[in-house]
Amino acid sequence: MIRQRTLKEIVKTTGVGLHSGRKVTLTLRPAAANTGIIYRRTDVNPPVDFPADPASVRDTMLCTALVNDEGVRISTVEHLNAALAGMGIDNIIVEVDAPEIPIMDGSASPFVYLLQQAGIEMQNVPKRFIRIKKPVRFEDGDKWAEFVPFNGFRMDFEIDFNHPAIESDEQRLLFDFSSQGFVREISRARTFGFMRDIEYLQSQNLVLGGSFDNAIVLDDYRILNEEGLRFENEFVTHKVLDAIGDLYMCGHPIIGEFRAYKSGHGLNNQLLRAVLADQEAWEWTTFEEEVGSPVAFAEPNMVLA
């Protein structure tokens, strides 16, 4: 059968918080089967847990943030969550000693490396997939996102940036999900922003940790990072990375096709909520045989980077 996965060992790293600019320690811990993905703030007493759940996402202004009724939050979870999806991790405790996950280099790649360092432990319980049974669509002005039935996990994502540095033929990406494909084609794509927006936000005491080390920065005409892009379609690829992280907030791999036009964290989350709220739109499924799986996850000892 296709089994649930956790980590073999505890791993730790430190990085900078995108919004605070302060040092953040991130600890990833193995968890028992059927625990799910739990984000935990350890710097508050008692510690506060946020189970991966689309209803926990209450702020999507500059990132995906989990917020509880008392206003305790963990921001910028989407890149780590995408890495968990990419590596097929079902059960994990994610601990941070700050209100945000460290931004690292602005991509999911450092988190993939961290998960590979920890190693993957197979658990003797079937992995539970969410299978999309009928189309569900969510619109916001000219932006939209939808799920349709498909025997696999496919992303068809289009952005629309009228900018000299963003080629018009590099604004759409079709990606058939697999662990290998995620690591090689998606995980290294960095977040991006405009210098004028970053300067304004920093004047408001936001994105204080934002820098050329963790984002692609643009002015009105060009990319300001000396090293340029990691690949030509890095912008739309990062939007796919974000969507993979946002959609994995249900805590389970999805079998279906996600199509989107100009979607972002808020719309991704609203679509996920709409799907789960409609009992006829989806069903649980497990796979007795590895061969029958429509989604290919990495072998536990596979080096993908």
From Swiss-Prot:
HAMAP family from the UniProt entry: LpxC (MF_00388)
Any one Gene Ontology molecular-function term assigned to this protein's record: UDP-3-O-acyl-N-acetylglucosamine deacetylase activity
Gene3D superfamilies assigned to the protein according to its UniProt record, in alphabetical order: lpxc deacetylase, domain 1 (3.30.230.20), lpxc deacetylase, domain 2 (3.30.1700.10)
Function: Catalyzes the hydrolysis of UDP-3-O-myristoyl-N-acetylglucosamine to form UDP-3-O-myristoylglucosamine and acetate, the committed step in lipid A biosynthesis.
Active-site positions on this chain: H265 (proton donor)
Pathway the protein contributes to: Glycolipid biosynthesis; lipid IV(A) biosynthesis; lipid IV(A) from (3R)-3-hydroxytetradecanoyl-[acyl-carrier-protein] and UDP-N-acetyl-alpha-D-glucosamine: step 2/6
Keywords of this entry: Hydrolase, Lipid A biosynthesis, Lipid biosynthesis, Lipid metabolism, Metal-binding, Zinc
Enzyme class: hydrolase
Transmembrane regions listed in the UniProt entry: none
Name of the featured protein: UDP-3-O-acyl-N-acetylglucosamine deacetylase
Family: Belongs to the LpxC family.
Any GO BP: lipid A biosynthetic process
Cofactor: Zn(2+)
Ligand binding (Zn(2+)): H79, H238, D242
SUPFAM superfamilies to which the protein is assigned, alphabetical: Ribosomal protein S5 domain 2-like (SSF54211)
EC assignment: 3.5.1.108
A GO CC term assigned to this protein in UniProt: membrane
Cited Pfam families: LpxC (PF03331)
Catalytically driven reaction(s): a UDP-3-O-[(3R)-3-hydroxyacyl]-N-acetyl-alpha-D-glucosamine + H2O = a UDP-3-O-[(3R)-3-hydroxyacyl]-alpha-D-glucosamine + acetate
